[in-house]
């Protein structure tokens, strides 16, 4: 009898130990935008399974949830979004799922309010914080903590991945500053389709002017086109930039208006603003997006693109492998 009881207890202990040591399934993460989803993948590694809602060319200001998106949210363990009304039309859906499961607005959780750019519109805050790499890197420790709370067995992995990735972001931040500094001072003006580069301009010392407002929901009128054409002509701006998520017609309208005033200006290239590029392309990661943007800006405005720092050599090698 005693032997039977001993065997039973031993079996229960072994089963309990096996359950405790059994690996947890990957944390199912849904991120609204690529600039969050990519960082979630870098921090989470094999301990997370990330789905990004809005792909290349997606406009978070105008995006509305489909029935498929609602199913994706329902299947998630946790939901990550930018906050500050970037995904304005998803607000009701995010609020509803926030009552059901961990839902994190990464920007308000990670970035001090005094670091924000305030604007005089119904949003009150410029939500494009990822344009300042040093500022956006603050979401990394937030994600480390958030993921560790839900998968404590992977906490060490999250910490190591987060620290390594943040070193890359620090190197990228310095490289962008050095790159922009090579542009002649009188040409250091960035004209874009909409006003998404305010944090970029503040962080890297380049004047930024958007044809459209902070949100693509705002309309561009004839007065806006004329005002911008006057600025471009008076400042002798060498190039304007289109954006991957916005129809280029407003930029082309400004170019036409500038030419009517007897001046010439061209398109300096396409920039990634509210979405990253296709996977496997130069802008298909967060680091790649900012690297591609900076390379195009510097080249078009008369600067010289410096070599990448050693801390980004691993990223550059992985990009070449993906091509």
Locate the predicted segments by residue.
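Extracytoplasmic metal-acquisition and chelation regions
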Residues: 20-323
């Amino acid at each position: 009898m005693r032997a039977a009881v001993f065997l039973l207890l031993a079996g229960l202990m072994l089963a309990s130990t096996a359950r405790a040591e059994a690996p947890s399934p990957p944390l199912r993460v849904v991120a609204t935008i690529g600039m969050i989803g990519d960082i979630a993948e870098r921090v989470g590694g094999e301990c997370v399974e990330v789905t990004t809602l809005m792909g290349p060319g997606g406009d978070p200001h105008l995006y509305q949830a489909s029935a498929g998106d609602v199913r994706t949210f329902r299947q998630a363990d946790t939901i990550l979004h930018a906050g500050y009304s970037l995904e304005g039309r998803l607000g009701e859906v995010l609020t509803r799922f926030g009552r059901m499961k961990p839902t994190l607005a990464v920007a308000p959780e990670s970035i001090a309010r005094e670091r924000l750019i305030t604007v005089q519109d119904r949003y009150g805050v410029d939500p494009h914080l990822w344009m300042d790499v040093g500022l956006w890197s603050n979401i990394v420790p937030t994600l480390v903590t958030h993921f560790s709370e839900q998968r404590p067995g992977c906490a060490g992995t999250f910490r190591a991945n987060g620290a390594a990735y943040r070193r890359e972001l620090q190197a990228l931040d310095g490289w962008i500053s050095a790159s922009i500094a090579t542009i002649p001072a009188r040409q250091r003006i960035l004209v874009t389709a909409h006003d998404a580069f305010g944090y970029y301009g503040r962080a890297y010392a380049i004047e930024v002017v958007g044809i459209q407002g902070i949100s693509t929901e705002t309309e561009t009128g004839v007065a806006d086109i004329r005002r911008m054409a006057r600025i471009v002509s008076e400042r002798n701006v060498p190039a304007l930039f289109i954006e991957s998520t916005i129809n280029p017609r407003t930029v082309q309208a400004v170019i036409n208006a500038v030419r009517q005033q007897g001046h010439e200006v061209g398109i300096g290239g396409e920039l990634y603003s509210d979405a990253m590029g296709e996977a496997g392309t130069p802008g298909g990661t967060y680091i790649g997006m900012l690297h591609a943007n900076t390379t195009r800006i510097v080249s078009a405005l008369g600067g010289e693109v410096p070599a990448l720092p050693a801390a980004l050599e691993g990223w550059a090698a992985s990009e070449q492998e993906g091509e």
